[in-house]
Amino acid sequence: MPTKGDYQPPKDGILSKLPESAVPYGELLRIHRPLGYYLNISPYVVGVAYTAAISPVTLPSTFLLGRLVILSLWGFCIRSAGCAWNDLIDMDIDRQVSRTKLRPLPRGAVSPSGAALLAAFMFGCGGSLLLLLPSQCAFEAAIVVFFALLYPFGKRFSDHPQLILTNIAWAIPMAMSSLDMSPLDFPIPTLAMSFSIASVIVMIDIVYACQDAEEDKKVGARSMAVRYMEITDQIAYGLFFSGTLSLLVGGILRGLGFPFLIFSVGGHFLGFLRFLRASLGKGAKSALVESQAKSSCLLATMLLVFGLCFEYCVRL
């Protein structure tokens, strides 16, 4: 069992700026791991930009910005709550995996009750933001929260827990609802855009999970990285190409033009192709996976949103 003596306090980064007593809680919320926050918040940014680009009426920029802030805060709260909840449920598994055995709960720096209270608080903060959004958003939010609570149990009962993470793709219909547009008005484009987001999330998580695949197999933790260890590359590329195609379909069906095709689809393709080429085949313990994911995802999303914003401006 890991002990506090095995743990080295952070000497740099955001955690080093916190009071010593607050560091374990910052670690529990993963505030030092921006990739997870990016993956939870960026779909809402894409959702707002996509809705603005396809809306039959011109949506005021101030209205769009206001909704973007609320949805981004929602994504931040749900990501934080999900991390605390996941670590609480996974505490027994985390103790047995080298990469996770020194997390706050396994090493005893945070009590289970403390983690539960923190998770409940962050879920509550997220829930309070729904008061600022149309009532329809509560339905999409409930789906997101349900699957966030379910996720840590997935690796115990299924070889495909990554599929639970597709709940993040509900950011697209939730963003549309927040802007007073029903996702059912454009069901196929909405589904295509949501599938594109879901494909990216699952792709990145599978590649990231390869770091722990061997140890997960030994301790009985199940995942797609463990189940399909021999064909991880093929699955990742399959998700990449299907996600790119879905993005293309989602734009074409709503009449988006060359700015979308060149910047949004092109940026998605180049950004995530860069990620896969840099991350796959580097070995299960590759230190490049997270850094490549951060830079590649940022590049892909910036170009995707730029293309959608270009389409919005053209329609003004």
Curated annotation (Swiss-Prot):
The protein's location, in the record's own words, is:
Membrane
So which cofactors does this thing need?
A: Mg(2+)
Q: Which EC class heads this enzyme's classification?
A: transferase
Q: Which GO terms describe its molecular function?
A: 4-hydroxybenzoate polyprenyltransferase activity
- Cellular component, GO annotation: mitochondrial inner membrane
- Asked if the keyword Transmembrane belongs to this entry, the reply reads yes
- What pathway, per the record? Secondary metabolite biosynthesis; terpenoid biosynthesis
Membrane topology annotation: Multi-pass membrane protein
Would I find Transferase among this entry's keywords? Answer: yes
Return the InterPro entries for the record: Prenyltransferase (IPR039653), UbiA_prenyltransferase (IPR000537), UbiA_prenylTrfase_CS (IPR030470), UbiA_sf (IPR044878)
Entry EC number(s): 2.5.1.-
Print the keywords alphabetically.
Magnesium, Membrane, Transferase, Transmembrane, Transmembrane helix
**Which terms under GO biological process does the entry name?**
terpenoid biosynthetic process; ubiquinone biosynthetic process
TM ranges: 45-65, 69-89, 114-134, 135-155, 163-183, 188-208, 231-253, 257-276, 296-316
Lineage top rank: taxon? Eukaryota
Q: Name one Pfam family in it.
A: UbiA
* Catalytic function, reaction form: 3,5-dimethylorsellinate + (2E,6E)-farnesyl diphosphate = (3R)-3-farnesyl-6-hydroxy-2,3,5-trimethyl-4-oxocyclohexa-1,5-diene-1-carboxylate + diphosphate + H(+)
**Where mainly located?**
membrane
The similarity comment for this entry is: Belongs to the UbiA prenyltransferase family.
What role does it play? Polyprenyl transferase; part of the gene cluster that mediates the biosynthesis of paraherquonin, a meroterpenoid with a unique, highly congested hexacyclic molecular architecture. The first step of the pathway is the synthesis of 3,5-dimethylorsellinic acid (DMOA) by the polyketide synthase prhL.
Q: What is this protein called?
A: Polyprenyl transferase prhE
Q: Give the originating organism.
A: Penicillium brasilianum
